[in-house]
């Protein structure tokens, strides 16, 4: 099971691969849409990659609740537990 810091780091790598954003700009308090300018298509790719990387399932209806990077970290952390 990954720690929250490992999840954050892993998500930053996934976001970087999808968007080209530097990993150090992917912080827990950043909004996927407002701060990182991630559209819904990119978000779905990020979710799929996160599911694979962390061996979790993130149902589509839950994705809309993942507004910030921190929301996603907490969700993945809980889903692993």
Swiss-Prot record:
One of its GO terms (cellular component) is cytosol. 4'-phosphopantetheine is transferred from CoA to a specific serine of apo-ACP by AcpS. This modification is essential for activity because fatty acids are bound in thioester linkage to the sulfhydryl of the prosthetic group. One of its GO terms (molecular function) is acyl binding. GO terms for biological process: lipid A biosynthetic process. Residues 2-80 form the Carrier domain. The modification O-(pantetheine 4'-phosphoryl)serine is found at residue 40. Gene3D superfamilies: ACP-like. Transmembrane segments: none annotated. Keywords: Cytoplasm, Fatty acid biosynthesis, Fatty acid metabolism, Lipid biosynthesis, Lipid metabolism, Phosphopantetheine, Phosphoprotein. InterPro entries: ACP, ACP-like_sf, PP-bd_ACP. Pfam families: PP-binding. HAMAP family: Acyl_carrier (MF_01217). Carrier of the growing fatty acid chain in fatty acid biosynthesis. Belongs to the acyl carrier protein (ACP) family. This is Acyl carrier protein. It comes from Kineococcus radiotolerans (strain ATCC BAA-149 / DSM 14245 / SRS30216). The lineage of its organism: Bacteria, Bacillati, Actinomycetota, Actinomycetes, Kineosporiales.
């Amino acid at each position: 099971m990954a720690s929250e810091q490992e999840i954050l780091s892993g998500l930053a790598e996934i976001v970087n691969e999808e968007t080209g954003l530097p990993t150090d700009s992917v912080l827990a308090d950043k909004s996927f849409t407002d701060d990182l300018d991630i559209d819904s298509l990119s978000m779905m790719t990020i979710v799929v990659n996160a599911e694979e990387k962390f061996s979790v399932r993130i149902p589509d209806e839950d994705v809309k609740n993942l507004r910030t990077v921190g929301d996603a970290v907490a969700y993945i952390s809980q889903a692993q537990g």
